[in-house]
Amino acid sequence: MATRTNATVTHLSKHLELHQYHPDTIDSGEPRPTVVFLPWMNATQAHANHYRELYAVRGFNVLTVWGSLSYFLWPQWAMPLATELADYLEMQTRGPLVVHSMSVGAYLYAVTLTLIADNPDKYGSLGSRVKGHVYDSIVIGTLEEMARGVSIIVAPKSAMLQQAIRRSCLLYFAATKQHTVVPYNRFIDVVHNSPFKTPKLCFHSYNDVLCLPEAMERMIHHWKDEYDLDITSKMWQNSPHASHLRTDPQTYNRLLNDFLKKVGLDNISLQLSSKL
């Protein structure tokens, strides 16, 4: 079984980290698939390892993308990282790609999607190589709901501080509308109408205040109604934000297995990094 102890880890930059559990090619000589993993804002390496190893034991290598809350508060600051990520995927990877984004990590992916959608000639190969998306506890909703989400991320244990932060965020958004609200709306639209019309696996819960079930269901219905996409959705009644793997690992693993089979990436040869 592949674990973090036998991965070759390459820090490509401050924000990009490659865990190579297996050789670059599979037995057939084809390029090995890579998972692009965008974790939640306060995730640690230990947290990330739980998700990386989900894919390591299934034959994938994993590219982790580390973001910052500042990228959400001022979208223009996220553009260099989005460009770095898109350039790396286009120029430095050759095989199939699966994107697994969590919480605010999905926001950073939305910025990257917007860049890719605006530059189809530059990122042309990605359209055929991105095979599927896993959306886990993504922060989604209205501007009011996003402000509430920021307050919970910053002050998870103080309701009074959350209220102050939420109000400050709304004032901030009103004062910086052209630089924040307008880009947010574009990012949301691009996720709804992604250039990658792939199957999607969505994890969320009824009691998650950051990933509102009504907003998530609206997006899922849009994908199905407008694009006839294959969507698998699992909503728990009671499971903390970005903790569904811990809440119900059996169901999480089963649905992930089914999803990878659906996108044709379920029988990847395992050659652990000790053979590199």
Question: How should each PLM-predicted stretch be described?
Answer:
Residues 40-41, 139, 206-208:
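Residue-level signal for short, function-critical loop segments
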Residues 68-93:
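Catalytic nucleophile-loop/oxyanion-hole region of alpha/beta-hydrolase
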Residues 97-103, 133, 202:
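Conserved alpha/beta-hydrolase fold motif
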Residues 126-179:
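Hydrolase active-site cap/lid region
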Residues 163-258, 262-263, 268:
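Serine-hydrolase catalytic core
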